[in-house]
Amino acid sequence: MKGYRKYFVNKLLWLLVTTFFAFILNFILPRLMPGDPVAAITARIAQGMSNSTGMKEFYQQYADLFGTNKPILEQFFLYIKNVVHGNFGTSFSQYPRPVLDIIKSSVVWTVCLQFPAIIFGWIIGNTLGALAAYTKKGFDKVLMPISIFVSNIPAFGMAVILLVIFGVNLKWFPTSGGYGFDLIPTFSWRFIWSVIVHYQLPFWSIVFTAIGGQAIGMRSMSIYELNADYVKYSRFMGIKDRKIVGYVFRNAMLPQVTGLALSVGTMVGGALVAEIIFSYPGLGYTLLNGIMGQDYPLISAVTLIITMMVLLANFIIEIVYGLIDPRIKAAQSD
């Protein structure tokens, strides 16, 4: 247990260091965008005004309000202080609405869409890869070309393919939104059914993107394990094939858990693209609106939340991996 404790503390320290740099990048990157958001707000509010002095006063008022006229270092420490207290500021593009109000519902939509889809795609992909390695012949010959083809389709490509086929041509599913535009969010069966129907295309676009690569990886690892010396020895000793296969797939699964941790960031990025294409009311669509409106607080808040979701998912996967792989404890004990 001492070895695992050392492993846990090491991963926790890396999480804290990465989080610190995430704060810095989430503050700096939106401010590197061209344009002046305060000037855009002033122009929108002061439409029709011909008095340049009045417009300058408006500009100064909003620059003071948002703190954009303060030194960049002072802005950064103020940003850290506000975020620690759960205050992401006021939206530039939707003033005077607080950023936290905007992203509250978006987080729920994103979490409910992305993580079930990523985990489901990972499970299905690994199951298909294991079956292909074990059965070989026909199933393997069909699965491998399909998996290679699917794994090379980018996230936006898969989303567009499903949108065109099942949304535009067949009209089986709606093409945009999280629910019907004529509905108000309630717990009525009509609203719930609308959410389920709108959920399908974004969900399956993420699942299909995840399946291909996982199936290829699991097949390769399973074939390697099936040809290992301990499998041949076990068969020579007369151990039942079902028991041997259980050990084989357990060993083959360990690198796939690591692969999930490494690829979860890419998967989340692809899922955000799917949200944008389907106008799904998650963080991806909110982030797009923030970028279009040069909304520093909204962009910083959304990217920080996405980053933290990915970091925490990686951390949890690595901690679970340490529990299921005894080699981790042994290595840390040395």
PLM features: what roles do these ranges have?
Residues 19-74, 171-191:
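Hydrophobic alpha-helical transmembrane segments of membrane transport/permease proteins
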Residues 25-32, 79-81, 146-177, 205-207:
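Membrane-water interface segments at the C-terminal ends of transmembrane alpha-helices
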Residues 1-4, 65-126:
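An internal, D/E-rich "acidic patch" concept
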Residues 53-85, 278-290:
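Short hydrophobic, aromatic-rich alpha-helical segments embedded in or entering the lipid bilayer
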Residues 11, 144, 160-161, 247, ...:
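Residue-level recognition of transmembrane alpha-helices
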Residues 2-5, 103, 107-139, 155, ...:
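Alpha-helical transmembrane segments of integral membrane proteins
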Residues 14, 120-121, 147-150, 163-167, ...:
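Transmembrane alpha-helical core residues of multi-pass small-molecule transporters
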Residues 9-15:
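N-terminal signal-anchor/signal peptide hydrophobic helix marking the start
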